[in-house]
Curated annotation (Swiss-Prot):
The lineage of its organism: Bacteria, Pseudomonadati, Pseudomonadota, Gammaproteobacteria, Oceanospirillales. HAMAP family: HisB. GO terms for biological process: L-histidine biosynthetic process. The keyword Amino-acid biosynthesis applies. This is Imidazoleglycerol-phosphate dehydratase. The keyword Amino-acid biosynthesis applies. It catalyses: D-erythro-1-(imidazol-4-yl)glycerol 3-phosphate = 3-(imidazol-4-yl)-2-oxopropyl phosphate + H2O. Its EC number is 4.2.1.19. The gene is hisB. It holds the Pfam family IGPD. Its main location: cytoplasm. It is an enzyme of class 4 (lyase). GO terms for molecular function: imidazoleglycerol-phosphate dehydratase activity. One of its GO terms (cellular component) is cytoplasm. It is found in: Cytoplasm.
Amino acid sequence: MAERVATVSRDTHETQIQVHVNLDGQGHFQCETGVAFLDHMLDQVARHGLIDLDIHAKGDLHIDDHHTVEDLGITLGQAVAQAIGDKRGIRRYGHAYVPLDEALSRVVVDFSGRPGLSMDVEFTRASIGRFDTQLFWEFFQGFVNHAQVTLHIDNLKGFNAHHQAETIFKAFGRALRMAVEPDPRMAGRMPSTKGSL
């Protein structure tokens, strides 16, 4: 299988972002976004997804974190889509349940070519530190629109908002890892009866 790596840049009046992704990595992570809690969550994606991520971002954080978080989702989605190519030989579907103490989340992903986000999460706090929990939806919406995936995120249990978020991102990483894995039984074929995704 060809090397599955991509580097994508996004440069707007609001943000300047570069994302490098290696889908067949070791979980190496380097990130400077200015949004510390999101950096912590993206570290979980890299580590549990065994995806190498190198992310650099500058955004209009003097306004708030919204543009930076949304644009990071967009750029990461573009990088994953570019790295995965035409999707021949991948498992396509991935899912994971992840607990952290009292919290439990489930994430299911389909590299369907059809962007869609279903996110059933009621955070117990409006913010985690200074991070607005509404921005998680913006991040994932940006990701699905540009990775062209269907993504279901459900927080099943939890009263600690940090734990809720961490289980979501760990499960997201593990679901991605499963979905993008080469399936030896597919032998390079397209995982769809349509013949394309």
